[in-house]
Amino acid sequence: MGIFNWVKQLFATKATTRSQATDLQALFGGEVTASLTLPHYQAYPLVTPTTETELSAYQLHCLLNDQDKQRLDTLLCQAGFEHVGSDMPFNGVLHHTSLQTTVFLQQYADFAGFCVLLITNDINLLQQLITFKAAPPAPWESFPDVDPDTLGSLQGNLEFWCDAFWRPYWLSLGETERLQYPTNWFEFSEFH
């Protein structure tokens, strides 16, 4: 799915934004989730407070490679949440099998991996997600026809991918990990 389809999907979702916001408010607006101390440094993907301040939950927004998406699915199952097929689009709520906690999960395939938005009030799951180190597909996998040496300002799919997924991943890496990338993609990542 390219940026056009993503935007189309987003606008289709915007039609139900009010009801979805109400649904999220119903899921995460009641009891206050126990406070979670986020470490100063986190590996990718980053756990952050939700952007909706009235929600008592935390979120994870990331792009995962196939292997790490399967690891996330396993983690969710082991944490007591319902199983969702790892390669199918999903937009809904997962209930814990024995606790009063929930996960709102949105996932779809794009950029040679899986885009994931996960919102939860389950502190045990969140603590595991903070230590869950994962990676998006390599840039040359997400954009096989792109030569990073020819890129100036970014637009469209590439800009969205870079802002939403690649930059947070790149900034979470140490210098040694960054130096493992091909020179042209290293320079692209440092510049953008």
Report the location of each language-model feature.
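Polar/charged low-complexity regulatory segments
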Residues: 2-192
